[in-house]
């Protein structure tokens, strides 16, 4: 009986260990693969503030360019491309969470007009699938299918991201009209400087939290530094903790001021936002325009023929 209980206890411990290990793995992988979109999705109902600012800029403090290209106009119920370009120098390396250097990832958020959404797979042509590559898009939330997010994905391969978009049809959706609509985009390259809870990442600059003398610098194995700042007037000590990644700019015995830079700024990435306009074109207007252009061309042809006929009559009368 005792052996049976012992075996059962060992079995329970093994099962618990496996469950915890799987849980940690899943959480870790999820946080790595979905870091950029999740930060915005968890904290903001809408990624674009009333001021027009996209919330990704709250964590990615450096400003970098981003570009978007869409057709000037589209017909209803049509699949088209929205191309987002996130340029950066692929030779540069960023500071990773463990303090080592690595390549930059990119991420993007595309804010479409109401009614526009990600094209279903069966509507995407093979040519467009080849342009998209091996990446997947997701809606910002179940109620906001017009807002698409992606990332992080390797920047070396996806500095240009092609979104397959399906235009709405006013005939089936009463809230959609044949108008000119704005499209907004935000794109980042590299890690952010601030986490959603307000704490700093190791991909930013660190400042002194007190004035005084750097009495000691303790290097923590794989954990950065502890900088001990002593106030000469009363001997009070303040410890500033620097994570692995940023390079120190101060040394022991150096006098420093409040907010003085303790490290360099390791950030090589940044965030940018842009916009474009697209017209949802009424097919009947297009047909009317084509009919008008055809009428103009025919009128010109008849005018030329009439002119030549008149010239022939004049020439005949002169000869007669």
Curated annotation (Swiss-Prot):
GO terms for cellular component: chloroplast thylakoid membrane. Coiled coil: none annotated. Heme binds at residues 36, 56, 59-60. It is a single-pass membrane protein. The 4 large subunits of the cytochrome b6-f complex are cytochrome b6, subunit IV (17 kDa polypeptide, petD), cytochrome f and the Rieske protein, while the 4 small subunits are PetG, PetL, PetM and PetN. The complex functions as a dimer. Belongs to the cytochrome f family. Keywords: Chloroplast, Electron transport, Heme, Iron, Membrane, Metal-binding, Photosynthesis, Plastid, Signal, Thylakoid, Transmembrane, Transmembrane helix, Transport. Pfam families: Apocytochr_F_C, Apocytochr_F_N. The keyword Repressor does not apply. The chain crosses the membrane at residues 286-306. It is found in: Plastid, Chloroplast thylakoid membrane. Component of the cytochrome b6-f complex, which mediates electron transfer between photosystem II (PSII) and photosystem I (PSI), cyclic electron flow around PSI, and state transitions. It comes from the Eukaryota. HAMAP family: Cytb6_f_cytF (MF_00610). Binds 1 heme group covalently. The keyword Transferase does not apply. Residues 1-35 form the signal peptide. One of its GO terms (molecular function) is heme binding. InterPro entries: Cyt-f_TM (IPR024058), Cyt_f (IPR002325), Cyt_f_lg_dom (IPR024094), Cyt_f_lg_dom_sf (IPR036826), Rudment_hybrid_motif (IPR011054). This is Cytochrome f. PROSITE patterns: CYTF. GO terms for biological process: photosynthesis. Its main location: plastid. Its cofactor is heme.
């Amino acid at each position: 009986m005792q052996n049976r209980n012992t075996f059962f206890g060992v079995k329970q411990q093994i099962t618990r260990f496996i469950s915890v290990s799987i849980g940690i793995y899943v959480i870790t992988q999820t946080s790595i693969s979905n870091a950029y979109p999740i930060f915005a999705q968890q904290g903001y109902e809408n990624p674009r503030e009333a001021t027009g600012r996209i919330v990704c800029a709250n964590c990615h403090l450096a400003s970098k360019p981003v570009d978007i290209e869409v057709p000037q106009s589209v017909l209803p119920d049509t699949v088209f491309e929205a191309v987002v370009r996130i340029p950066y120098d692929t030779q540069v390396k960023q500071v990773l969470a463990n303090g080592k250097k690595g390549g930059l990832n990119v991420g993007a958020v595309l804010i479409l007009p109401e009614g526009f959404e990600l094209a279903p797979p069966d509507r995407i042509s093979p040519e467009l699938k080849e342009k998209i590559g091996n990446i997947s898009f997701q809606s910002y939330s179940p109620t906001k299918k017009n807002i698409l997010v992606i990332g992080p994905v390797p920047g070396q391969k996806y500095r240009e991201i092609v979104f397959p978009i399906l235009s709405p049809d006013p005939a089936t959706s009463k809230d959609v009209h044949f108008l000119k609509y704005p499209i907004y985009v935000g794109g980042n390259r590299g890690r952010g400087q601030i986490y959603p809870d307000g704490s700093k990442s190791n991909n930013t600059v660190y400042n002194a939290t007190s004035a005084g003398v750097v009495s000691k610098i303790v290097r923590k194995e794989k954990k950065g530094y502890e900088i001990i700042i002593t106030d000469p007037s009363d001997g009070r000590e303040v410890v500033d903790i620097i994570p692995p990644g940023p390079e120190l700019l101060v040394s022991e015995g150096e006098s420093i001021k409040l907010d003085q830079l303790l490290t360099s700024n390791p950030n090589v990435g940044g965030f940018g936002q842009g916009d474009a306009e697209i017209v949802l074109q009424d097919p009947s207007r297009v047909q009317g325009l084509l009919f008008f252009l055809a009428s103009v061309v025919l009128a010109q042809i008849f005018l030329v023929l009439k002119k030549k006929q008149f010239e022939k009559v004049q020439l005949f009368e002169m000869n007669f």
